[in-house]
Amino acid sequence: MKKINSILMLLAALIILIPTNACAQRVKFSNSSIVPAAEGAVKVRKDKNNNYLIKVNIDNLAAPERLTPPRQVYVLWMITEDNMPKNIGKIKVATKFLSSKLKASFETVSSIKPMRIFITAENDASVQYTDYEVILTTNNF
């Protein structure tokens, strides 16, 4: 009995000490009518400093120059808790070595909790407000 209790205590300690992504939220982007082949997801997790780590991965996202009308760059936005859009960076589309598959990824840290993530195609990556169509969006977290 003593041996079983020792083993259970050890297992409980390991479960507590092993870092996991259990606290991370993963939300897929909704299907896009503008770039229908694009698929991706956003993972958001709170770090030990109470900041939010935001990771975005997208497959089959066409280059913004191939859109109609063409644009220069994709911009990633988040909707904050006060329902305001915030530009959090640009996304570069590239092909992997020895592959024709277009991939895009993005990672940032925010002190503000994101409620929703969306992507627009813009002519300038530093825009603070968008007038253009949303290319991809998530549901609320």
Spans of features found by a protein language model:
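Bacterial N-terminal signal peptides that target proteins for export
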Residues: 1-10
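Charge-rich, low-complexity N-terminal segments
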Residues: 2-3, 18-25
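Bacterial N-terminal signal peptides
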Residues: 9-19
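N-terminal targeting/export leaders
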Residues: 23-141
